[in-house]
Amino acid sequence: MLRGGSMTAELGVGFALRAVNERVQQSVARRPRDLPAIQPRLVAVSKTKPADMVIEAYGHGQRTFGENYVQELLEKASNPKILSSCPEIKWHFIGHLQKQNVNKLMAVPNLSMLETVDSVKLADKVNSSWQKKGPTEPLKVMVQINTSGEDSKHGLLPSETIAVVEHIKASCPSLEFVGLMTIGSFGHDLSQGPNPDFQRLLTLRRELCEKLGIPVEQVELSMGMSMDFQHAIEVGSTNVRIGSTIFGERDYSKKPALDKTADAKASVPLVQGH
């Protein structure tokens, strides 16, 4: 069974993808029957990795990729080799987004989803920017929740969730609300029971759906990374963000400079576990 980035480097991206997809299906089989029967989406997180590795993963059937930094995503998604070799590619932005970077993000070719809306003001800015682009369909967005309560992580307070989702649905016609996203605390000991941060997101979804009259199966849950994606799927995740297990460990010495407008929180590799 594939566990670490070192094996990925030795055996290749195709082998790693097959192994991850097998583990995804094993986890789906262990999921309680009372959860929505939604096939989890695998987001291959390619941050710090070259275009050739994205193309290799695409060649092995992967279609959805994620990036944490706006500039890196824009450069990678605009790469001529990726544009020509990966016509069906879909990009998710999964990092912290500041309002001054919104227009740059909206210019990303094949942008499919923004997973990290964390305020009404950001939602309004994204809605306006996407509207000006003149798209044929709304941009899919998730609302990010800080379920762990850690200062080092971005996201709404759980108590703010319903109000922000209501605002998006009522006042942002160029956005399509599709789910909730969280990072959660790292290193939870599963012998102590399910990750409480994941459980908190499930509870929030139930409360949200009851309050707004939304069918549960229409609200995705993005939770789980390389170190905990199987547990996340077992408890209900429909979108897992996996990087090093597919592409190998990252060399941060070669990572592109962070967006100049990134704040102190964003400069910390919060989602290094992808």
From Swiss-Prot:
Belongs to the pyridoxal phosphate-binding protein YggS/PROSC family. The modification Phosphotyrosine is found at Y69. It comes from Mus musculus (Mouse). Keywords: Phosphoprotein, Pyridoxal phosphate. GO terms for molecular function: pyridoxal phosphate binding. This is Pyridoxal phosphate homeostasis protein. The modification Phosphoserine is found at S6, S226, S244. Coiled coil: none annotated. SUPFAM superfamilies: PLP-binding barrel (SSF51419).
